[in-house]
């Protein structure tokens, strides 16, 4: 894929008009308050992972409305009494997989909490958490992007984002986690989830947001025909009369609107040839991000973004942040 979006100098200034409903904050306050009525009840069950330098725990905690969510907690076998923690969110249709799939952060001296994404985990890494839709489910295009999309209260990502906030709380409850060094991280869908949590969680202290999905929906579906955004396009291709209803729902889940409310230090990344999460949708979120921020730009990369290069940048970013703090 060659360059297809705005020139870089325009991307750096790109701040489209934000569309959000007046009750955006109220919607999320009520959503989180509903789930806080249920005990978090985190369970950390030590397991035999055959890893020599990492202790692995099979995690279960209460997410949206008390529904039980799976995860992993990976603790490096170090002498420190308290360790920083990275809460990791997963890309589209991936699940938590196995503990040995998530060894990068433990090898860097961080506890890693991996949240399984409800209903997903049959596309690349396996998942173990079912989704529990909100009442009757309207017709949808195959996938997750249009599940419950005719009402923000029934939309799939309402449940996912709530799970993700509760995941930070579950991670924070583990005795060895340093409360002042909790990081939320993810790429693609995981980046979009982490971006939402950066505005919704009071416990997260830093954000690592790579090639984020779930940002500036209307431009994304009008600019690219790749999946997963194409799920929305194909839904509207059939349901020709639902455009405004769909984009109204999506406004409650748009990373651009969460970015405008986020305050914690953040490191973003973008691939300028990314035809899955187009550069302008990433820059829309980045340019509205209200906290201290940096972005790493990879001109000749598609959705893989910076790969291992970005991982090095993240380690340096957190080292500088926490040493300064």
Swiss-Prot record:
Catalytic residues, per the record, are 188 (nucleophile), 274 (charge relay system), 303 (charge relay system)
The record's Gene Ontology biological-process terms are:
cellulose catabolic process; cephalosporin C metabolic process; polysaccharide metabolic process; xylan metabolic process
Question: Does the keyword section mention Cytoplasm?
Answer: yes
The UniProt keyword set, sorted, is:
Calcium, Carbohydrate metabolism, Cellulose degradation, Cytoplasm, Hydrolase, Metal-binding, Polysaccharide degradation, Serine esterase
Spell out the InterPro entries in the cross-references.
AB_hydrolase_fold, AXE1_dom, CE7
* Uppermost EC category: hydrolase
| E.C. number(s) listed in UniProt | 3.1.1.41, 3.1.1.72
Cell location: Cytoplasm
Result when mutating residue 188 to A: Activity abolished towards fluoroscein diacetoxymethyl ether
Question: What's the reported outcome of changing residue 228 to A?
Answer: Reduces catalytic activity by 33-fold against fluoroscein diacetoxymethyl ether; 8-fold decrease in activity against dimethacryloxymethyl ether; 4-fold increase in catalytic efficiency toward dicyclobutylcarboxymethyl ether
Give the binding site residues for substrate. Answer: 92
Coiled-coil ranges per the record? none
Q: How does it assemble?
A: Homohexamer, formed by a trimer of dimers. Also exists as a homodimer.
Described by its record, this protein's role is as follows: Esterase that removes acetyl groups from a number of O-acetylated small substrates, such as acetylated xylose, short xylo-oligosaccharides and cephalosporin C. Has no activity towards polymeric acetylated xylan, 4-methylumbelliferyl acetate or alpha-naphthyl acetate. Able to catalyze rapid hydrolysis of a range of substrates preferably with acetate groups, independent of the alcohol moiety. Exhibits a narrow selectivity for short chain acyl esters (C2-C3).
Q: Give the family per the record.
A: Belongs to the carbohydrate esterase 7 family.
Put simply, this protein is called Cephalosporin-C deacetylase
């Amino acid at each position: 894929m060659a360059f297809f979006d705005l020139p870089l100098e325009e991307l750096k200034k790109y701040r489209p008009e934000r569309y959000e409903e007046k009750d955006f904050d109220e919607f999320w306050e009520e959503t989180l308050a509903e789930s806080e009525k249920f005990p978090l009840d985190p369970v950390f069950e030590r397991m035999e992972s055959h890893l020599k330098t990492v202790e692995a725990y099979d995690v279960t905690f209460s997410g949206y409305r008390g529904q039980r969510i799976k995860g992993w907690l990976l603790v490096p076998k170090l002498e420190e009494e308290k360790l920083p923690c990275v809460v990791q969110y997963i890309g589209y249709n991936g699940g938590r997989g196995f503990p040995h799939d998530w060894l990068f952060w433990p090898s860097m001296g961080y506890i890693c909490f991996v949240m399984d994404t409800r209903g997903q985990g049959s596309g690349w890494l396996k998942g173990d958490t079912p989704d529990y839709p909100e009442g009757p489910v309207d017709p949808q295009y195959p996938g997750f992007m249009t599940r419950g999309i005719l009402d923000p209260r029934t939309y799939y990502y309402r449940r996912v984002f709530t799970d993700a906030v509760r995941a930070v709380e579950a991670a924070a409850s583990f005795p060895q986690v340093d409360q002042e060094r909790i990081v939320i991280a993810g790429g693609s869908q995981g980046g979009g989830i982490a971006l939402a949590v950066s505005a919704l969680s009071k416990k997260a202290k830093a954000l690592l947001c790579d090639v984020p999905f779930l940002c500036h929906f209307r431009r994304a579906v009008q600019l690219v025909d790749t999946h997963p955004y194409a799920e929305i396009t194909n839904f509207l291709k059939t349901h020709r009369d639902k455009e405004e209803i769909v984009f109204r729902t999506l406004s409650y889940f748009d990373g651009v609107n969460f970015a405008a409310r986020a305050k914690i230090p953040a490191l973003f990344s973008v691939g300028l040839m990314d035809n899955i999460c187009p550069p302008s949708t990433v820059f829309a979120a980045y340019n509205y991000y209200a906290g201290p921020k940096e972005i790493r730009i990879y001109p000749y990369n598609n959705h893989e973004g910076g790969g291992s290069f970005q991982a090095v940048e993240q380690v340096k970013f957190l080292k500088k942040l926490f040493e300064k703090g």
